[in-house]
Amino acid sequence: MSNSSIEKIDNKYNFKIEYKLINNKELLKSRLSEIPKSSGCYLFKDIDNNLLYIGKSKKLRSRVSSYFNNYSDLTPRLSLMVRQITEIEIIVTDSEYEALNLESNLIKTNKPYFNILLKDDKKYPYLCITWSEKYPRIFITRRRRNRNNLDRYYGPYVDVGLLRRTLFTIKKIFPLRQRPRPVYKDRTCLNYSIGRCPGVCQEVISSDDYKKIMQQVSMIFQGRNDDLEIFLQKKMLQFSNDLDYENAAKIRDQISGLKLLTESQKISIPDSSINRDIFGIVSEKNVASIQIFQMRSGKLIGRIGYSQKLNNEDENHILQKILEEHYMNVEAVEIPSEILIQYNLPKQATIEDWLTELRKKKVKILIPKRNKKHETVEMVLKNAKLELDRILNGIQDNESSIEDLAQILELSEQPKRIEGYDISHIQGSDPVASQVVFIDGIPSKQHYRKYKIKDPNVFVGHSDDFASIYEVIHRRFKKWSRFKKSGGDFSILNDKTNSKLDNELLSDWPDLIMIDGGKGQLNAAIKALNELNLEEEVTICSLAKKNEEIFIPGFTKSLDTDENQKGVLLLRRVRDEAHRFALSFHRDKRSKRMNRSQLSQISGLGPSRIRELLEYFKSIDAIRIASKEDLSKVKGLGKNSVNDIYEYFNEL
């Protein structure tokens, strides 16, 4: 690769840059001057052509150059990203608005690693209705897959418990499809007999009539309970006038159930006849708490909370980022006509235009100073402050736990980054390991890693946790052994303020690693570190489940601790999370193996076809209920294969 090359195709520029240019500021400045000054998007890529980050700017050259001007001004996360950049792709647009729209679409499609603003926040659930299917399903999911455009997602919802209860109640009020696939081949099940299902599996009800029921259900998730109640009242009156008292009674029961459901939906605000979202942000001690309240037809149907470090950014810049990312992840029809915030955003007019284009109707961003709207914003800010207090109290608790752990292990420095390792298998089958990471006492899920155990001595019927731990620790720290052999100075890792420190090293080096297990597991990890000549650099301990005993190198007995000490409780959280993550990975791996095993019994299906099937349908259950038309959409499946798969599952 040359030092730099610019290739222009229409409005797209490819700008390649060698890693060594990062440290040659004069040459780098010259290359960056070739970037256009106009508005557009920039895409950062690494040496393997993986997308690292997608951004937008009104002035591309100055924005891109700002990443390389002064590394000391960058956060550790951004510094780590910049050091991986080997190619910058530029896409020029006619306006800042077009750049925002393009950025949104590119991020949705590519999901770059460094674009996810809220990595540590849990994935909030959505409710999906599969309108693309003959008999639509309704279910809760945390993953918005690229399904058919006809399918509809509602949400996200912060309270999954409430969402589950709501869906359970809806299925009691309305006769809906209860199962992903039929129980019997030629008759209905008990749900049909008791009126819980209209006989979808045997097509007792037509597709059109069933979709009418689903349209009524969808009104609930649009916050249109009152409209639905009026509709049902008219329907009940019509049945009554026709002397069809049985169906009138069914509608009456639906109305009663709907009223109970409506009463359970949080709070009601009389001022809110218009659908609106209300954003509020408060900050303290470099931590911001953001709350989003979703009002639909005067009712609060959803509430979402985020937390974010300020990192020298103003609250309004953080709020703008949150707002942009939030609306990148919702259906266009879920964008309300009004958005209330506490003060102006840096690019407010541009964002209004972008949201209006997405929604196909006017969207207003308002900063109310008085009346009911202002009171609503104040209510959201009050909730954000309560959440911030909870977060700060948690940080304080974590700090005292880390301090106590440092005293227990007699560490010279408090462990900022703690890694936990665990092994999971069933009698040697599908052996896997997990690496979880806690930073400042909080799980950092973007740093989690999964390992498939490759040791040939670990197989079905012969498990060896010691060999597995040895392998994982050896693989994890092998690059550090190379770093030491090449003359790397480990002493700088203890100086967190060293401006010369490579942030990639800093972000990846643990202050403490914890092995789930006793003395044997600890010795296996120590053996790996000894072979890598890293035994002096890595601080390590193990935590045994029996009596929560802590073992450290050089001691045959466990440390004298109280299992309810704050430091021990922190280690237990790390250990339990490592166990959960390893078990989850093991179950997933075992499930995939069993799915492949079942599909391999079908004539003509090789590994590549099986992989295509599972990637398309995601599960064996989805393949089992798929029609021939659905199966034929899978890449590479011929007519004979489609028939073989369909007949295999329909003859079981």
UniProtKB/Swiss-Prot annotation:
Q: Which domain of life is it from?
A: Bacteria
Q: Which UniProt keywords apply?
A: Cytoplasm, DNA damage, DNA excision, DNA repair, Excision nuclease, SOS response
UVR domain segment(s)? 226-261
GO terms assigned for molecular function: DNA binding; excinuclease ABC activity
Q: Name one GO cellular component term.
A: cytoplasm
Q: What is its main location?
A: cytoplasm
Q: Where does the UniProt annotation locate this protein?
A: Cytoplasm
Family per UniProt? Belongs to the UvrC family.
Oligomeric state and partners? Interacts with UvrB in an incision complex.
PANTHER family documented for this protein:
UVRABC SYSTEM PROTEIN C, UVRC/OXIDOREDUCTASE
Q: Which NCBIfam families match?
A: PRK00558.1-5 (NF001824), uvrC (TIGR00194)
Q: What is this protein called?
A: UvrABC system protein C
Q: Can you name the source organism?
A: Prochlorococcus marinus (strain MIT 9312)
